[in-house]
Amino acid sequence: MKTTSLKPAEVDKKWIVIDAEGLVVGRLASIVAMRLRGKHKAAYTPHVDCGDNVIVINAEKVKFTGRKYNQKSYFYHTGYPGGIKERTAKFILEGRFPERVVEKAVERMLPRGPLFRQILGNLRVYKGTEHPHEAQQPQALDVGALNRKNVSA
């Protein structure tokens, strides 16, 4: 039997919506990263973007386990000498763009390769329940029902 290798024209991309309310960030990010790459499909091809389009809503309501909400640090650099800055997860989630926590978690679980930017472009994260992708008729994926540890108590 021959190994199937998909061509870009043969890829069937679906739209998936995930409600992140009460979900653990790392567990959510690993499931989203797998869906974005297409590794859940039998016809996965490493050199072709065969993953689905994923919409994550309620990103400001994600949970951290342990003390990570107060202690986890995110670093960035301003570009100037000595310009390293640090923000906690609490500061980001209570700020203007809480969806960055989910975006960074997923981004750091994807491999840095030729398809990285293209795959990351298939991720849409929104802080509220509203999203502008109703025309694509996304299917809901209940991540909390996949494993009881995905939901924080």
Swiss-Prot record:
Protein name (record): Large ribosomal subunit protein uL13
Q: Which family does it belong to?
A: Belongs to the universal ribosomal protein uL13 family.
Q: What does this protein do?
A: This protein is one of the early assembly proteins of the 50S ribosomal subunit, although it is not seen to bind rRNA by itself. It is important during the early stages of 50S assembly.
Gene Ontology cellular-component terms listed: cytosolic large ribosomal subunit
UniProtKB keywords: Ribonucleoprotein, Ribosomal protein
Please name the NCBIfam families in this protein's record: rplM_bact
BP GO annotations: negative regulation of translation; translation
User: What InterPro entries is this protein classified in?
Assistant: Ribosomal_uL13, Ribosomal_uL13_bac-type, Ribosomal_uL13_sf
Q: How does it assemble?
A: Part of the 50S ribosomal subunit.
The protein's organism comes out as Methylobacterium radiotolerans (strain ATCC 27329 / DSM 1819 / JCM 2831 / NBRC 15690 / NCIMB 10815 / 0-1)
